[in-house]
């Protein structure tokens, strides 16, 4: 039995030309679709970065505040530690302060939320994979540092509440004295860590080209409760020095 392939009406040469035209048309359509998709992601990425600016600006201000305030915070904690160590059988009470937003405290330190909602949304929506690779790496590094600061800051907030006890003339035995000193030392170490991470985050945000203007940073620091407290009590502040 013999099979015969059907012949195109106008011959194989013309048929091949028609098929070629169709293939080229499909390739052009696919290429145009890819160009449109790339343009859409470019526009979406640009809009997302614009939406990210306020969140990054807030974190940049918080990191600057933390870096500047930590030397003052450490001095306050060192004074409290000396008070615990030098007290007799009863704690010599530390001064207690209060403000509109804080009912009472024995030392003043930054307490921030270190927001990341916009960045998380960019990850969920797949926008970050379409960012410039260098920008993506820097932002990811910055937000990783900020995330660690958030967790640590929650911990120092809890210690601050517990150290309100230092404003009372509570009995001290060797165990309770050592425990209080350990709490204070933990807070000092945590603030040192946050200072380092803050300065590293400052560098990443700065390198990303998304840092706020210096005048905005200065204006925010001028109204920082911790900075104002340190200046009012003559306790030295530090500097915000971006580092690797």
Where would I find each of the regions flagged by the language model?
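Long, hydrophobic alpha-helical segments that serve as membrane-spanning/inserting helices
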Residues: 1-13, 34-244
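Hydrophobic membrane-insertion alpha-helices, especially the h-region
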Residues: 18-32
């Amino acid at each position: 039995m013999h099979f015969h392939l059907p012949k195109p009406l106008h011959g194989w040469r013309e048929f091949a030309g028609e098929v070629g035209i169709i293939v080229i048309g499909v390739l052009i359509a696919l290429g145009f679709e890819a160009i449109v998709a790339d343009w859409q992601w470019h526009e979406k990425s640009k809009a997302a970065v614009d939406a990210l600016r306020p969140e990054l600006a807030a974190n940049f201000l918080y990191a600057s505040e933390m870096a500047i305030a930590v030397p003052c915070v450490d001095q306050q904690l060192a004074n409290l530690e000396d008070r615990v160590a030098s007290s007799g059988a009863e704690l010599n009470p530390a001064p207690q302060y209060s403000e509109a937003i804080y009912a009472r405290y024995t030392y003043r330190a930054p307490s921030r939320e270190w927001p990341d909602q916009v960045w998380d949304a960019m990850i969920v929506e797949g926008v970050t994979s379409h960012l410039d690779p260098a920008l993506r790496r820097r932002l990811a590094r910055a937000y990783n540092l900020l995330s660690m600061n958030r967790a640590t800051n929650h911990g120092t907030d809890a210690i601050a509440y517990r150290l309100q006890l230092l404003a009372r003339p509570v009995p001290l035995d060797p165990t309770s004295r050592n425990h209080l000193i350990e709490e204070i030392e933990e807070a000092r170490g945590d603030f040192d860590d946050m200072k380092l991470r803050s300065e590293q985050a400052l560098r990443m945000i700065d390198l990303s080209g998304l840092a706020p203007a210096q005048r905005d940073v200065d204006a925010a620091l001028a109204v920082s409760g911790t900075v104002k407290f340190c200046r009012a009590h003559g306790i030295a502040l530090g500097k915000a020095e971006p580092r690797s």
